[in-house]
Amino acid sequence: MMSNTILPRNFYERPTLVVAGELLGKMLKFSNFSGIITEVEAYIGMSDPACHAAKGYTNRTSVMFGMPGFSYVYFIYGMYYCLNIVTEAEGFPAAVLIRGLKLIEPLEANLGGPGILCKRLNITKEHNKQDLTISHEFCVYESHLKPDYVCTPRIGISKGQEKFWRFKNLRSCVDYLPIG
């Protein structure tokens, strides 16, 4: 199911909506955890009012303007971190938010919601601006899973809700696990 092939930079250096759909079923690896990506959201450029880069370049959003394949981790509601992966060409601010994960190592229930996911994996601000294309400790691996998914409006935002840029698996990831 999981290969040892880390997704290369050119995987992320494509249109964000393409990357978002293709991240579903891939394996996120962080420290001793690995799991199937089950839900993501796309945030694309300064014309997207829900994108953190909508108001331009800042210290916080600088990573979004950088090379694709880097992590963008930020703090919300005074209690949760969120993990994004930068997409598109350098200079164009875009990223995919990782919203859901089915943990395989250790085998656990689905981690739904970006804050819960980061809390369980212990992803914090110190993991911001990490190159996910070089280290087997924090990366996304290729997999042979090609899940069916649905696109819906993004959730938990006040602007840009009309965009169907949330990608979610149609079936449980348990369906993808080997039996026995």
UniProtKB/Swiss-Prot annotation:
Q: Does the keyword Hydrolase apply?
A: yes
GO biological process per UniProt: base-excision repair
EC number(s) per entry: 3.2.2.-
What SUPFAM superfamilies would the database entry show? FMT C-terminal domain-like
Annotated GO MF terms: alkylbase DNA N-glycosylase activity; DNA binding
UniProt keyword list? DNA damage, DNA repair, Hydrolase
Organism's domain of life? Bacteria
Per the UniProt entry, what species is this protein from, by scientific name?
Wolbachia pipientis wMel
Protein family per UniProt: Belongs to the DNA glycosylase MPG family.
Tell me if Hydrolase is a UniProt keyword of this record: yes
Q: What is this protein called?
A: Putative 3-methyladenine DNA glycosylase
Q: Which residues form a coiled coil?
A: none
Pfam family of this protein, just one?
A: Pur_DNA_glyco
